[in-house]
Structure formats: structure tokens, C-alpha cells
């Protein structure tokens, strides 16, 4: 059986945490900041955790990452 391959697009977007969770960046941070408040922009800068319902699927894509 061939080796499992890591989904490279996902590997660039997610980072594993020490406790087995996954960190991600927020969407809506590329442009058009004039329509967002300072508070919104500040919160969008911080990393977020992947929701529980998505973790299993993403971990399968990142199977070979340590």
C-alpha cells in the first residue's frame, strides 16, 4: 500500500499545539480594513483554534506531520 501523503495546502495553514489541538488564522484579513473597527482588526490578528467538528478531518489530512 502506498504511503499516506500530507495535504500540503493544509500543512501551510494549520499548526499543531502541544495538547493536540490545531491553530488557524482568521479569514477576512487580506484587504478592505476600512470597513472594520479597530477592535475587529485587533481580534483578527490573533490565532484561533480549529473547532471540534473539523479537527478529525483536518488531522487526517495532516497525518504525516509531527
Swiss-Prot record:
Instruction: List the InterPro entries hit by this protein, alphabetically.
Output: Ribosomal_bL35, Ribosomal_bL35-like, Ribosomal_bL35_CS, Ribosomal_bL35_sf
Which GO biological-process labels does this protein carry?
A: translation
Disordered: region residues:
1-23
Arranged from A to Z, the UniProt key words for this protein are: Ribonucleoprotein, Ribosomal protein
Transmembrane feature ranges: none
Which GO molecular function entries does the Swiss-Prot or TrEMBL record give? structural constituent of ribosome
Question: Where does the source fall among the domains of life?
Answer: Bacteria
Q: Could you name the Gene Ontology cellular component terms for this entry?
A: cytosolic large ribosomal subunit
Name the HAMAP family on file. Answer: Ribosomal_bL35
Hey, which family's this protein in?
Belongs to the bacterial ribosomal protein bL35 family.
Q: What is this protein called?
A: Large ribosomal subunit protein bL35
The organism encoding this protein is Lactobacillus helveticus (strain DPC 4571)
Amino acid at each position: 500500500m502506498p504511503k499516506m501523503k500530507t495535504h500540503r495546502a493544509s500543512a501551510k495553514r494549520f499548526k499543531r499545539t502541544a495538547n493536540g489541538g490545531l491553530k488557524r488564522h482568521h479569514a477576512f484579513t487580506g484587504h478592505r480594513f476600512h470597513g472594520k473597527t479597530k477592535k475587529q482588526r485587533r481580534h483578527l490578528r490573533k490565532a484561533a483554534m480549529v473547532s471540534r467538528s473539523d479537527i478529525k478531518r483536518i488531522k487526517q489530512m495532516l497525518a504525516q506531520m509531527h
